[in-house]
Amino acid sequence: MIKNFLLKVYIYLKKKYIGFELVDKNKINTEIKNSNYNYDNLLNLIIYKNKIFKKKNIKQNNNKYKIFKDIFINKKLIKILDVGGGGGHKFYEFSKIFKKIFFWYNLETLSLVKLLKKKFPNEKNIKHINNLRNLRNKIDIILCDSSFQYIEKQKKFLDDLIALNSKYFYLSRTFMNHIDNDQLCVMQQTLLSENGPGKIDNYMKDQIISYPCYIYSSSKFKKQLSKNYKLIKFSIDNDDFIIINRQKYFCHEYLYKKK
């Protein structure tokens, strides 16, 4: 328990005060780049959290759902692409809150997709995929919730998402470079227990894990989206940030609608 406490203190200080140093993304080896949701401890944690989350009671008056109420109000079947959706917990979350029929594509790493299909072979209306070629339906809304910042080739990936021609595009909890047009890269450190939906107090096997985090230019992001989409909501969370070379980069939220 003392070790876990010290790890939490270190990560807190690292995030809020010390910060991270810029790294050259070309010098990050392939093994580290592919580590996200690709090694056993993290995979098993995601599965464990997913089982807990399915049993969790969701508060229907939660403010974070208000943004979707108008989008879903006149639709019975809603097709969603959840980019980096972990174990697919948002599918269960949305189904409980909105009482709609969802068909859910959960885009994740190949290792996690294989494990999810093995552990939950009889899931209905949710399909775990590891690339966009597996999409079989036109998408109503694309969700990128704290996932875009872990994509290395962000411009190309964003272009691929835009090409899907979804009616809505929603990005949230994503660090953005509001200062210039550069893509920044750091080796982000987090606690293992912080990954996936929610946190587990006193997690017995907690440890520090590291993986690349890419901070995309907010101006480039808006320019790419503006060709096909109209911005209908934007906010910055001043309490959620990453420090890189003593500069804060805040989490952004965007909701776009197809023109």
At which residue positions do the language-model features occur?
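Conserved acidic residues
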Residues: I78, D140, K167
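A short, conserved alpha-helix within the catalytic core of class I
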Residues: Y150-L164, L171
